[in-house]
């Protein structure tokens, strides 16, 4: 979008591995009364995104944080799912290794709609693991929302797993 709209500004990368020096540089920039936009290449900043730690630092430094509402995969998916949305639990990304099975097991007794994020290369494995714990329940997999290849697959674990195995 930045290139499309010919926006010419400094860009700084911020991620899980950003150093204290990089964080301090951004905070100094903000303290100098400069405006900064936190954007993400995958959804809403700070939602299952390392941006929350920068926000936390801004708050501790008493730097104003002004949210600008926009597209969110979480709300887009839940609104198009057809599943109950009066109460839902947002899980975010499951751990990739340590604690993964424990986290999945902890979902068993939740009686709300569950919303998870998952990468395409782990999706099938995750669906199978969730099915073992949650049984055959209605599910929706929504991906590439609002993009050219948007896809919303509704069914249960069995039918959805078959869909992705094909």
Language model features: what each stretch is:
Residues 5-9, 28-30, 55-57, 81-86, ...:
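Short, hinge-like loop/turn segments at secondary-structure boundaries
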Residues 53-110:
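Class I SAM-dependent methyltransferase SAM-binding "motif I" and its flanking Rossmann-like core
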Residues 13-20, 71, 91-96, 144-146:
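Short, acidic/turn-prone active-site loops that include or flank metal/cofactor-
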Residues 1-66:
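Class I S-adenosyl-L-methionine
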Residues 8-15, 65, 86-92, 136-142:
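Short hydrophobic/aromatic-enriched beta-strand-loop microsegments
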Residues 24, 49, 77-79, 101-102, ...:
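Short, well-ordered secondary-structure micro-motifs
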